[in-house]
Amino acid sequence: SGLITNIPLIKKIAQKNKPIILSTGMAFESEIVKAMKTIKKYNSRELAVLVCTSIYPCKDYMINLSKISTYKKKFKAIIGYSDHTQDNFASISSVLMGAKVIEKHITFKKMNFGDHKISADFKEMSKLIKGIRRAESIIGKSKIEPNNEELKFRKLYLKKIISKKKIIKGE
């Protein structure tokens, strides 16, 4: 994030023609666009642009995951999220919003200084990955049709009237 305005450095990196992850903390839209144009001019590989708030730790009201849908509309790139919160909720929520790449700091030992306080330890990282996989499962497919489990119940419940008590003919 802190180097998004360093166009000579971005150009040098782009010329390596490797996939690039561009974090956008503290950046204005015009700066993101300029960095992306530089990358795309010199690099034909994949580009991921991450929504990021460069505050450590980042409070919920600062996160603004709505940017994910804005980025998806405005930028031709893979969109992701760079998480600087102290739990996994924002990362998992970002997947539900459409993020395809997640950046989360990891540490061997939790400490109350530097990046350590916002970093996940190995147990938390494992929970994050499981949470992301669950979120992906919840998202499902965009087809408008019943899933296989619903189809099993379709014959039982579709166009039927069910009564709690016996109905006598003529009632």
Go through each PLM region and give its residues.
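Catalytic cores and adjacent flexible loops of soluble metabolic enzymes
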Residues: 1-171
